[in-house]
C-alpha cells in the first residue's frame, strides 16, 4: 500500500480538527439544551408538548453528534475508509433531522404569541393547582401580571402580581413570548454553527475516504 501524500495528510488533519470542533460544538449544544430545559421546566404546564420536548431533543442531538464525531476522529486516525463513510452517512442523517427540526421551530416561532395567549387565557378562565402555580412563577419571575395586564383578574389580583403593594402593570404574554423566542434564537445560532462544521466534515471525510481507497488499491 502506498503512503499517503502531503495532500492526504492535510485532509486527514482537517477531518480530525473539524471533528474536535464538532465535539466542542456538541458539548455547547448539550449545554444549551440543558439550559433551555431548566428554564422551560419551570413553566411546562403552560407550554405546548413541542416546546416541552425541544430541549430534550437538542440534548439528544448533541450526544449523537458527540458519538459521531468520535467515530470520525477514529476513522481519520486509523485511515479506515468504512468508518469514514459511516461517519459521513450519519452526519447526513443528522443534517436532515436538523433541517426538519429547524422547519418545525420556524413554524412554531410564528405561533408562539397565539399559543401562549390561548394557554394563559385558558389558565385564567379554568384554573387548577398546577396551572395556577405555573402562572405564579411566570408573574414572579418576569414581573408581569395576567395575560395582557392586571385587569385580566378583574380586581382579584394574586400576590404573585405584586411587589409589596405595587402591582405589575405589564402583561405576561409579551414578556413570556419574548423569553421563548430569545431562547429559540440562542439554540438556533448554536445549531447553525454545528451544521456548518458538519457540512464541511462530510465533504472532507468523503474526499479523504475516496483518496485512501485509491491509495490502498495502488
Curated annotation (Swiss-Prot):
Question: What's the family?
Answer: Belongs to the tetraspanin (TM4SF) family.
Task: List cellular component terms (GO).
Answer: plasma membrane
Provide the transmembrane region boundaries.
13-36, 56-71, 83-108, 184-205
**What is this organism's lineage?**
Eukaryota, Metazoa, Spiralia, Lophotrochozoa, Platyhelminthes
UniProt cross-references to CDD domains, sorted A to Z:
tetraspanin_LEL
Q: What InterPro entries has UniProt attached to this entry?
A: Tetraspanin/Peripherin, Tetraspanin_animals, Tetraspanin_CS, Tetraspanin_EC2_sf
For the keyword Membrane, the answer is: yes
Which protein, by its recorded name, is this? Answer: 23 kDa integral membrane protein
**Keywords from the named record:** Membrane, Transmembrane, Transmembrane helix
Q: Which residues lie on this side of the membrane: Cytoplasmic?
A: 1-12, 72-82, 206-218
Listed Gene3D superfamilies: Tetraspanin (1.10.1450.10)
PANTHER family reported for this sequence: TETRASPANIN
Q: Which organism is it from?
A: Schistosoma japonicum (Blood fluke)
Ranges in the Extracellular compartment? 37-55, 109-183
Q: Where is this gene product found?
A: Membrane
Q: Which Pfam families match?
A: Tetraspanin
Q: Which coarse location class describes where this protein primarily resides?
A: membrane
The membrane topology of this protein is: Multi-pass membrane protein
Amino acid at each position: 500500500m502506498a503512503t499517503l501524500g502531503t495532500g492526504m495528510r492535510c485532509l486527514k488533519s482537517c477531518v480530525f480538527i473539524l471533528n474536535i470542533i464538532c465535539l466542542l460544538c456538541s458539548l455547547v449544544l448539550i449545554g444549551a439544551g440543558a439550559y433551555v430545559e431548566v428554564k422551560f421546566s419551570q413553566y411546562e404546564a403552560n407550554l405546548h408538548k413541542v416546546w416541552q420536548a425541544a430541549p430534550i431533543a437538542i440534548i439528544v442531538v448533541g450526544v449523537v453528534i458527540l458519538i459521531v464525531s468520535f467515530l470520525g476522529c477514529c476513522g481519520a486516525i486509523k485511515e479506515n475508509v468504512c468508518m469514514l463513510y459511516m461517519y459521513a452517512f450519519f452526519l447526513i442523517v443528522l443534517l436532515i433531522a436538523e433541517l426538519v427540526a429547524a422547519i418545525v421551530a420556524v413554524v412554531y416561532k410564528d405561533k408562539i404569541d397565539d399559543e401562549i395567549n390561548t394557554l394563559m387565557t385558558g389558565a385564567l378562565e379554568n384554573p387548577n393547582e398546577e396551572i395556577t402555580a405555573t402562572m405564579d412563577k411566570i408573574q414572579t419571575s418576569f414581573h408581569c401580571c395576567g395575560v395582557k395586564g392586571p385587569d385580566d383578574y378583574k380586581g382579584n389580583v394574586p400576590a404573585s402580581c405584586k411587589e409589596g403593594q405595587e402591582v405589575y402593570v405589564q402583561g405576561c404574554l409579551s414578556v413570556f413570548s419574548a423569553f421563548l423566542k430569545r431562547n429559540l434564537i440562542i439554540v438556533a445560532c448554536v445549531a447553525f454553527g454545528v451544521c456548518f462544521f458538519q457540512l464541511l466534515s462530510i465533504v472532507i471525510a468523503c474526499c479523504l475516504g475516496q483518496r485512501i481507497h485509491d491509495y490502498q488499491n495502488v
